[in-house]
């Protein structure tokens, strides 16, 4: 993982907690999770509504 060990990751995590605070990190994580969920839902809906190549050829 790009040469990062456990110690380096813990140091980075500690710096992030100091900069943003624990509650802010939870809010950011929740917002990121909601964004990813909405993106996946949008991709899935787009795939369901998009006609396939086979159905395009049958209608011609």
From Swiss-Prot:
It is found in: Cell membrane. It is a single-pass membrane protein. It comes from the Bacteria. One of its GO terms (molecular function) is protein transmembrane transporter activity. It holds the Pfam family TatA_B_E. InterPro entries: TatA/B/E, TatA/E. GO terms for biological process: protein transport by the Tat complex. Forms a complex with TatC. Part of the twin-arginine translocation (Tat) system that transports large folded proteins containing a characteristic twin-arginine motif in their signal peptide across membranes. TatA could form the protein-conducting channel of the Tat system. NCBIfam families: tatAE. HAMAP family: TatA_E. Belongs to the TatA/E family. This is Sec-independent protein translocase protein TatA. It comes from Herpetosiphon aurantiacus (strain ATCC 23779 / DSM 785 / 114-95).
